[in-house]
Amino acid sequence: MKKNLLLLGLLVCSMTTMAQTEKAEKPESWYFKLGASYFNQTASTEFPVVGGQLPNRDVYEGTLANNRLVSRESVTGSFGQGFRSGITGGYRFSTRLGVELSANYYVSNEKTMSQTTNRLANPTTASATTPATYVSFTAEGQIKAFDLAPAIVMFLGEAHGFEPYTKVGVIVPVHGTLDIKTNREYTTFVGANQVAKTDAYSKDVVKPNATIGFMAALGTSYKLGKNLSAFAELEYRNFTVHGKTKETTEYTENGVDKLNTNTNFRVGSTASNHTHYVDRLDTNSNNALTNPNGVDQSKPMDELSSYVGISGLGLTLGIKYSL
């Protein structure tokens, strides 16, 4: 009897020890992460046409008939450089495998997309006795985007508090815009005398077509406590978008709203304020380049769609809480 009780006691102790060991070795199921990232662009491409202006950095010199292009360089880059903040929910199926879903907000650095210095704006009417207007402008773009990023995570094992992991996933944009802000300076001369100066400002908002991107990351977490860890990730993402529509939401001259007003420098029409991006222009398109009837100012302008890149390599630092 005593022998049976002793065996029973040993069995209970063994089962308790095994249960405690399994509990200790069992990975957390749900976890959450808060992180902040900084990305650098990994590839540069030529920027799209901005308001009819080629993606060049042009410099003109001379006056009237002697106003000539003396320097031109292509403006290249991408919107892959910038800051991102995000929150992530994850679930571990096993010691090695898990899934995550991240919600991220990204703001790129501003990038110069087109620039011109001292170009004669009215070459057909300017003369030594009639007004000659010269324009200088800079157009800068910035992307702001909210996306969801589901991913599969492979944990590589824990040692000395560190647990490295890798993950791959997709990037699904939920909302985002490319904001293009252009500052123009129009300087008007009659002969050698300056008779007028107009500072014009416009803001164009480009909305993209639906698309999808891809990401891969290598990271590690480090335990700070029972449920709290710090983590760091090196992430690469490959992502391009192309425009669907563009709207001029602001246009001022010397600080006065002229969005829907005809001026010496711009027609305040639907065609000026709205653009529909297409893959092909033909004689039926609302574009003066291909339509023999010119532009219908009461309808949105048709322009060729082009791509901009948001690919980048970034470092994310943050805190992880495990349930």
Model feature map: region roles:
Residues L5, A19-Q53, G161-E163, R280-N284, ...:
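Outer-membrane beta-barrel biogenesis signature
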Residues A36, I87-Y91, L101-A103, L148-M154, ...:
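Residues on the lipid-exposed face of transmembrane beta-strands in outer-membrane beta-barrel proteins
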Residues Y31, Y307-L323:
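Outer-membrane beta-barrel "beta-signal"
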